């Protein structure tokens, strides 16, 4: 990715008439997907980086890149890798013929370091402040297109958003008491969600949050949303509906579940899916007419 990819002036957004039912709003800013594939999970097989493990006949990292490559609204993809597997990922990108992958860069020891490396690269490339940045864990290979679209749409109203899935379990907040954990509080279940990715931001927002976090050597966030929540508390973070299938492959025990999801996806009939989407749109339109 070079500076010329992002140096086109962007007009100040103005209020436009609502688009027709089912139509997407006109896109005037870059939409950049950052696929984080730099982790070497200690809970996985240390000799086989999980990003390169095949699921459903395809490396996990390729599933994630595919999701953004096939989204018409995503303009560019940045892949962040561990230097040890850079060659393999570069080969895969070439073999798969991805047209939106602009650059593959080295990540850091922690997830936060990999995101920071991507943000630094984008700043150097001259990306505009209002660009939409979607940061996604490569090891969540089955992200739905609806989650990607929802993330992009959410940034029309907010400067930060995260895909999340409503918790079906009661969540306990704990504290230490002696050698044990004890329950401190029990939040209402309707207010609890499991964070997923992509996590999406206007570039200026996530860049500013990371600049503030960089001054705190003790801060080690597990995701990018928390950087905004902790360092820009006045910036609301919107929730975009996720799915149970958008799982994060963390251990070898997750592979059988991932294989079942991949088998279901590969077995879908595209014509039947298109027909189902059309029926859903017609039903939605009919419902609005009768309100």
Curated annotation (Swiss-Prot):
Keywords: Isoprene biosynthesis, Nucleotidyltransferase, Transferase. Pathway: Isoprenoid biosynthesis; isopentenyl diphosphate biosynthesis via DXP pathway; isopentenyl diphosphate from 1-deoxy-D-xylulose 5-phosphate: step 2/6. Residues 1-23 are annotated as: Disordered. InterPro entries: IspD, IspD/TarI, IspD/TarI_cytidylyltransf_bact, ISPD_synthase_CS, Nucleotide-diphossugar_trans. The record marks 189, 248 as: Positions MEP for the nucleophilic attack. Its EC number is 2.7.7.60. Gene3D superfamilies: Spore Coat Polysaccharide Biosynthesis Protein SpsA, Chain A. The record marks 43, 50 as: Transition state stabilizer. One of its GO terms (molecular function) is 2-C-methyl-D-erythritol 4-phosphate cytidylyltransferase activity. It comes from the Bacteria. The keyword Transferase applies. SUPFAM superfamilies: Nucleotide-diphospho-sugar transferases. It catalyses: 2-C-methyl-D-erythritol 4-phosphate + CTP + H(+) = 4-CDP-2-C-methyl-D-erythritol + diphosphate. Coiled coil: none annotated. GO terms for biological process: isopentenyl diphosphate biosynthetic process, methylerythritol 4-phosphate pathway. Belongs to the IspD/TarI cytidylyltransferase family. IspD subfamily. Catalyzes the formation of 4-diphosphocytidyl-2-C-methyl-D-erythritol from CTP and 2-C-methyl-D-erythritol 4-phosphate (MEP). This is 2-C-methyl-D-erythritol 4-phosphate cytidylyltransferase. It comes from Bifidobacterium longum (strain DJO10A). The gene is ispD.
């Amino acid at each position: 990715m070079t500076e010329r990819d992002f140096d086109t002036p962007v007009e100040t957004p103005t209020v436009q008439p609502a688009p027709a039912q089912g139509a997407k709003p006109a896109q005037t800013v870059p939409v950049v997907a950052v696929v984080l594939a730099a982790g070497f999970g200690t809970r996985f097989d240390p000799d086989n980086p999980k990003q390169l493990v095949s699921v459903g006949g395809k490396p996990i990292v390729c599933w994630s890149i595919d999701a953004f490559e096939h989204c018409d609204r995503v303009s560019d993809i940045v892949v962040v890798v561990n230097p040890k597997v850079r060659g393999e990922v570069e080969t895969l990108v070439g073999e798969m013929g991805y047209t939106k992958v602009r650059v593959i860069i080295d990540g850091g020891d922690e997830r936060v370091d990999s995101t920071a490396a991507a943000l630094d690269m984008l700043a150097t490339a001259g990306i505009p402040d209002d660009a939409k940045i979607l940061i996604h864990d490569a090891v969540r290979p089955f992200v739905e297109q609806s989650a990607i679209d929802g993330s992009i749409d959410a940034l029309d109203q907010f400067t930060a958003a995260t895909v999340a899935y409503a918790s079906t379990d009661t969540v306990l907040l704990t504290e230490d008491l002696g050698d044990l954990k004890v329950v401190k509080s029990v939040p209402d279940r309707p207010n609890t969600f499991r964070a997923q990715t992509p996590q999406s931001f206007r570039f200026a927002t996530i860049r500013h949050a990371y600049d503030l976090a960089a001054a705190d050597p003790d801060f080690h966030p597990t995701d990018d949303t928390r950087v905004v929540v902790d360092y820009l508390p006045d910036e609301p973070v919107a929730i975009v509906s996720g799915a149970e299938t958008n799982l994060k492959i963390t251990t070898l025990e997750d592979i059988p579940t991932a294989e079942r999801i991949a088998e279901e996806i590969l077995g879908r009939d595209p014509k039947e899916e298109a027909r189902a989407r059309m029926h859903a749109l017609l039903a939605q339109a009919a419902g609005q007419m009768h309100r």
